[in-house]
UniProtKB/Swiss-Prot annotation:
Belongs to the ferrochelatase family. It is found in: Cytoplasm. This is Ferrochelatase. It is an enzyme of class 4 (lyase). It comes from the Bacteria. Keywords: Cytoplasm, Heme biosynthesis, Iron, Lyase, Metal-binding, Porphyrin biosynthesis. It catalyses: heme b + 2 H(+) = protoporphyrin IX + Fe(2+). GO terms for molecular function: ferrochelatase activity; metal ion binding. Its main location: cytoplasm. It comes from Cupriavidus taiwanensis (strain DSM 17343 / BCRC 17206 / CCUG 44338 / CIP 107171 / LMG 19424 / R1). HAMAP family: Ferrochelatase. InterPro entries: Ferrochelatase (IPR001015), Ferrochelatase_AS (IPR019772), Ferrochelatase_C (IPR033644), Ferrochelatase_N (IPR033659).
Length: 371
């Protein structure tokens, strides 16, 4: 096996620490071609679709990609950001803003850490971002997937790709992985503050008259639960802790699961039918929040804010409120910093004094080092 070339080593250079934020991914543009390329990579991952390749790939290439690429492109087009200060895929824009804000906060508190974001599918890829970190001299890397609840379909495949990339390196960095943070107090507090801030601006639901808060998480096939994936349990725990933090009674909020794909049974209750049923019974107001998505994306902005609202109102519902994800809100950035710092303990987070670095270089050269 041939390993990728290493950057020239320089004695006297301070080793750097990096945090790699990983999210699912996004197409490069809201076009059928770009969306098709993204979906091909995403749906070809055996962690995502656990069907024998011989049966799945012909269906994917022959039916699903030709049909879904154009339809999905229209959905991406409906949410694509085109503002002067925010242009592109919402998920990528907000992920980059999170990375910049987290690095800024850490630096303000004396922690000299490089923060970068990567996508499991699409760009910027995990491989390209890790290569950039290597070129910057990052010898310690904390991988922090933006999946609060662990799942083999998300967190595990992000780790798989990190390992695959490092398998091509001769000089590998020290590595730490954050498996989940579904019940971390800072995460729950940031969620609570996001919902409370929305209610402070737009008024609270009247739970006494039957209004409801829906906590919608991304769904996965029920089979994964039966095979030992902890995702379902972690979603329920997040929902319970958030409900308690908001001071709600169990009947005032409900955990649901969205984004079902295919005909197999997924985790239930499903979000869309739940919204339709609430509309049918004449619910006055429904608020929907997606705790499992730290950044807004097509699943929140289009599937919930647009399609979900239509489901609810067509069925007879009246007042629909979509509560945006945390994105780069200050409480969430502070929570990210707290989570990261717990996992960074023991690593050097400050650059040694230049005199110390020069002394190291001099000692190495005295022993025959070239640089």
């Amino acid at each position: 096996m041939t390993f990728s070339p290493e950057p020239a080593y320089q004695h006297g250079q301070a080793p750097r620490t990096a945090i790699l934020l990983v999210n699912l991914g996004t197409p490069d543009a809201p076009t059928p071609k770009a969306v098709g390329r993204y979906l091909k990579e995403f749906l070809s991952d055996p962690r995502v679709v656990e069907i024998p390749r011989a049966a799945w790939l012909p269906l994917l290439y022959g039916v699903i990609l030709p049909l879904r690429s154009r339809a999905s492109a229209l959905k991406y087009e409906s949410i694509w950001l085109r503002e002067a200060h925010m242009t592109g895929s919402p998920l990528l824009v907000y992920s980059e803003r999170q990375a910049h804000a987290l690095q800024r906060l850490l630096h303000q508190n004396g922690h000299e850490v490089t923060v970068a974001c990567a996508m499991r599918y699409g760009n910027p890829s995990i491989g390209s971002v890790m290569e950039a970190l290597r070129r910057q001299g990052c010898e310690q890397v904390l991988v922090l997937p933006m999946y609060p609840q662990y799942s083999g379909t998300t967190t595990a495949t992000a780790f798989d790709e990190v390992f695959r990339v490092l398998g091509q390196w001769r000089n590998q960095p020290e590595l730490r992985l954050v498996k989940h943070f579904h019940d971390h107090p800072a995460y729950i507090s940031a969620l609570q503050q996001q919902v409370s801030a929305y209610w402070a601006r737009h008024g609270m639901p009247d739970f006494g008259r039957g209004d409801k808060l829906i906590l919608s998480f991304h769904g996965v096939p029920r089979r994964t639960l039966e095979l030992g994936d902890p995702y379902h349990c972690e979603c329920l725990k997040t929902g319970r802790l958030l409900g308690e933090a908001l001071g709600l009674q169990p009947g005032q909020y409900q955990v649901t699961f969205q984004s079902r794909f295919g005909k197999a049974e997924w985790l239930q209750p499903y979000t869309a039918p739940t919204l339709a049923e609430l509309g049918k019974v004449g619910a006055g107001r429904v608020d929907v929040f997606c705790p499992g998505f730290p950044a807004d994306c097509i699943e929140t902005l289009e599937e919930i804010a647009m399609e979900g609202q239509t489901e609810f109102k067509v069925a007879g519902g009246k007042d629909f409120h979509f509560i945006p994800c945390m994105n780069d809100a200050a409480p969430w950035i502070a929570a990210m910093a707290e989570i990261a710092l717990q996992h960074l303990q023991g690593w050097a987070l400050a650059t040694p004094h230049p005199h110390e670095l020069e002394a190291r270089r001099t000692r190495a050269q005295a022993r025959g080092a070239a640089a």
